[in-house]
Every structure is written in structure tokens, then in C-alpha cells.
């Protein structure tokens, strides 16, 4: 407690200078509460307003797929190079060292597998557990046009409402129904619906034609999914084109941890996202870093 015997009147009020407060100028976040903006400022670099997320949540429906057999051996060495980790609470508690001190986007939907209809998901994490785990956001699929579209949208709404109560951003992940074309028209629809429901971040796929229209029509930040494994040069070109056309980052898994050299690859992706390197320059970096 302060010593009450030596209280002095303050003198340095700088009355000639108006009070300032630096805004976190992220797309669509100007009206959000301080706590939610603070979490978003950990996900998106405040200087570049971009992010490189490392996704290794695939096991929630795929099991121990290639590259994720041992998270502690294959994925843990990548943690220090990622801006954000995207994983399930089971892996977070059992494998991720708390001292790594990286922001976490927590997978919060599930209850399906590759053996069944993928769109049939439920909310799989209570919001108080996401807070308990010090998550910076929670993520769930939204399957527009699928058999279980209605339930997936309800899942997102449930998480958004719970997130608003505690200052937790929600990332809506646009899953694709079996019979849906992966084109600009579909992803414009899916991303806009998720944003209209109140999601603060949208994860979607890059498309070669019209991606700039998807990004422009979405009022909150978009990060692109890496999708299936591509040759490194092609994956870096996809990153470059997405960022150039309005994406706010990437959320990559297989194109990093299934790479010939995952550390070199995540460094190359970082160069594209945060330093505007071309795919050609980034690929040269990958080759030079490749062990």
C-alpha cells in the first residue's frame, strides 16, 4: 500500500497535449470490446495486420494422418516459427508446452469423422474451457449448402454469442459440401453468411478466379486454408496471390508439416505474408533454408 504520509500533488499533466490511444486497425474490429481486440492483436501482427497460423487440428476427424503421427516430434519444432497455433484442446493439454506462449485458435467443433458425413458437426468445446485454456479465438466449421447446413450455422451462432460474453473471437471455417463447386460464387456466399452471423475471422479456400471479390465482400479478415499438399513453389504462389488479393493471412497445415523441410517452408510462408516477398523469392528462401 502507498505511504499516505508523503502524498504529493501531481505536476506533469502535459495539458498542452491531447490524450491519445493507438487504435488496432484490423478490418471489421473497430466496434469490438477491448478484450476481443486484444486477443485479435495477438493473432494478427499489429504492424502488418497479417498472420501465419499453423493448423494441426486435423486429428479431430482424420486421426493420426501423415505428418501428425507424433505431434511432439513432428509439429512441436515448428511452434516457435508460427504466429498462432490452431489445435484441439486434447492436443493443447497433452502436447503443447505452456511456456511456448503462442496464441491459440482452439478447434471448437467436432463429433464427426472421415467415416461419416463431415458436415454433421456439433459444438465440441464449452466457452468457459476455451477461456480456461487462455485461447485467443475458437474455431468451428460452417457448411453452407450441405445436408447439415442449418446445424453448422447454429453451431457458429452459439459460439459467437458465447464468445461475445467473454471477449472471445470466433473463426468460422468454410467447409465445402460434397456436391458444391469450389468457386468464387460459393465462397463469397459462405464467407459473407458467416460474417453476417457475427464471426470475427473467416477461414476459407483460395480460388484462382475471383478471390479478390471474396475478400472485398467479406467485412472481417479472411485467412486462407492451405488445403491439400502442393509442391512448395505452388503453395507459396497460392499464399502470395491470396495476400495480394486481400487475405489477412494463412492457416496452413499439410503444406507446412508435410513439406520436405517444414521449418524452411514456414519461414518462406512468413516472408510472403509479413514481408510481401514474391513466391519466387520465398521459394529461393525455402531452398536456402532447406537442411
Curated annotation (Swiss-Prot):
Its main location: cytoplasm. It comes from the Bacteria. Belongs to the DeoC/FbaB aldolase family. This is 3-hydroxy-5-phosphonooxypentane-2,4-dione thiolase. Involved in the degradation of phospho-AI-2, thereby terminating induction of the lsr operon and closing the AI-2 signaling cycle. Catalyzes the transfer of an acetyl moiety from 3-hydroxy-5-phosphonooxypentane-2,4-dione to CoA to form glycerone phosphate and acetyl-CoA. InterPro entries: Aldolase_TIM, DeoC/FbaB/LacD_aldolase, DeoC/FbaB_aldolase, FbaB-like, LsrF. Homodecamer. It holds the Pfam family DeoC. Its EC number is 2.3.1.245. The active site is at 203 (schiff-base intermediate with substrate). It comes from Salmonella typhimurium (strain LT2 / SGSC1412 / ATCC 700720). It is an enzyme of class 2 (transferase). Keywords: Cytoplasm, Schiff base, Transferase. GO terms for cellular component: cytoplasm. It catalyses: dihydroxyacetone phosphate + acetyl-CoA = 3-hydroxy-2,4-dioxopentyl phosphate + CoA. GO terms for molecular function: acyltransferase activity, transferring groups other than amino-acyl groups; fructose-bisphosphate aldolase activity. Induction: In the absence of AI-2, repressed by LsrR. Induced by AI-2, via release of the LsrR repressor. NCBIfam families: PRK08227.1. It is found in: Cytoplasm. Gene3D superfamilies: Aldolase class I. Transmembrane segments: none annotated.
Amino acid at each position: 500500500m502507498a505511504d499516505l504520509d508523503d502524498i504529493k500533488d501531481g505536476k506533469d499533466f502535459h495539458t498542452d497535449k491531447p490524450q491519445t490511444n493507438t487504435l488496432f486497425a484490423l478490418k471489421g474490429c473497430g466496434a469490438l470490446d477491448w478484450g476481443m481486440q486484444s486477443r485479435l492483436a495477438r493473432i494478427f501482427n499489429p504492424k502488418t495486420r497479417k498472420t501465419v497460423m499453423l493448423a494441426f487440428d486435423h486429428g479431430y476427424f482424420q486421426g493420426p494422418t501423415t505428418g501428425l503421427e507424433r505431434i511432439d516430434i513432428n509439429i512441436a519444432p515448428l511452434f516457435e516459427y508460427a504466429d498462432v497455433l490452431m489445435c484441439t484442446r486434447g492436443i493443447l493439454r497433452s502436447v503443447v508446452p505452456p511456456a511456448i506462449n503462442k496464441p491459440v485458435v482452439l478447434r471448437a467443433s467436432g463429433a464427426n469423422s472421415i467415416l461419416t458425413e463431415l458436415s454433421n458437426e456439433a459444438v465440441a468445446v464449452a466457452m468457459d474451457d476455451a477461456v480456461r485454456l487462455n485461447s485467443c479465438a475458437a474455431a468451428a466449421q460452417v457448411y453452407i449448402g450441405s445436408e447439415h447446413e442449418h446445424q453448422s450455422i447454429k453451431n457458429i451462432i452459439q459460439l459467437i454469442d458465447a464468445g461475445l460474453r467473454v471477449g472471445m473471437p470466433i473463426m468460422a471455417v468454410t467447409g465445402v459440401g460434397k456436391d458444391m463447386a469450389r468457386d468464387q460464387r460459393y465462397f463469397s456466399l459462405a464467407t459473407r453468411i458467416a460474417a453476417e452471423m457475427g464471426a470475427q475471422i473467416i477461414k476459407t479456400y483460395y480460388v484462382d478466379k475471383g478471390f479478390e471479390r471474396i475478400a472485398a465482400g467479406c467485412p472481417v479478415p479472411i485467412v486462407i486454408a492451405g488445403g491439400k499438399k502442393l509442391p512448395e513453389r505452388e503453395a507459396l504462389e497460392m499464399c502470395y496471390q491470396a495476400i495480394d488479393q486481400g487475405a489477412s493471412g494463412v492457416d496452413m497445415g499439410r503444406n507446412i508439416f508435410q513439406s520436405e523441410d517444414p521449418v524452411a517452408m514456414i519461414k518462406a510462408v512468413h516472408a510472403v505474408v509479413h514481408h510481401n516477398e514474391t513466391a519466387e523469392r520465398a521459394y529461393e528462401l525455402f531452398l536456402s533454408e532447406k537442411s
